[in-house]
């Protein structure tokens, strides 16, 4: 079983905005993990898990502040939509017909991410000292750890391992995942120096979350360990 960070896929130059996904996160045999953060009271409730959001009067300022993490997502140009995901992707295409871009990405491609987890403010040890890091490089290991603990518990109970996680996720979405209804992923992660100003680049188009069971921002939502253990007995 493999988990992989969906990564930061927006280009750091607004003139080169394009839809793209990375391998191996886009492989149908990999569980792709996106990222969330706690809402700051903008379009969401404070503390509610969201993908990147804007809030406050100064949108440029908030884009810089809250593009510290961004959940990459989209559709593969190399892999077709796998059978286990087909219904979820088709539902997204129909329910978001008036919101999403009509072109620029492969509508019949493998969609990522599959699910998401918190990607903000992980405590780490870097270069002989403590550090705080953020990104899907934190959320992917979090999911891997949850599944490893679940498999260990199942082993103690004399049960088989969970196996290929994607089948479980898409077949039991509402039973084991929590919906993420706010956020988008059209901005780059972090910030960069543009014309002497530290700013985040946001493309005119991107994907948003919340209007279907699965979306190319947070996937099916965030995994509940307790719900997973109940459904997987």
Q: Language-model segments: which ranges?
A:
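Extracellular protease catalytic domains of secreted zymogens
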Residues: 1-233
């Amino acid at each position: 079983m493999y988990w992989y960070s969906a990564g930061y896929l927006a280009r750091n130059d607004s003139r080169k905005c394009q839809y793209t996904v990375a391998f191996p996160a886009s492989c149908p045999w990999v569980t792709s993990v996106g990222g969330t953060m706690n809402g700051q009271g903008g379009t969401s409730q404070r503390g509610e898990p969201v993908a990147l959001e804007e809030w406050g009067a100064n949108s440029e300022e908030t884009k810089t502040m809250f593009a510290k993490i961004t959940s990459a997502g989209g559709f593969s140009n190399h892999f077709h939509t796998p059978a286990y995901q087909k219904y979820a992707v088709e539902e997204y295409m129909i329910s978001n017909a008036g919101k999403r871009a009509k072109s620029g990405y492969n509508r019949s491609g493998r969609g990522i991410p599959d699910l998401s987890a918190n990607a903000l403010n992980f405590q780490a040890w870097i270069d002989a000292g403590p550090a705080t890091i953020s990104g899907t490089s934190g959320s992917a290991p979090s999911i891997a750890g949850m599944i490893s603990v679940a498999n260990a518990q199942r082993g103690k109970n004399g049960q088989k391992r969970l196996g290929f996680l994607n089948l479980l996720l898409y077949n039991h979405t509402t039973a084991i995942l929590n919906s993420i209804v706010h956020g988008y992923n059209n901005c780059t992660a972090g910030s960069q120096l543009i014309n002497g100003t530290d700013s985040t680049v946001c493309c005119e188009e991107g994907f948003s979350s919340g209007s279907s069971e699965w979306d190319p921002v947070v996937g099916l939502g965030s995994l509940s360990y307790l719900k997973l253990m109940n459904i997987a007995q």
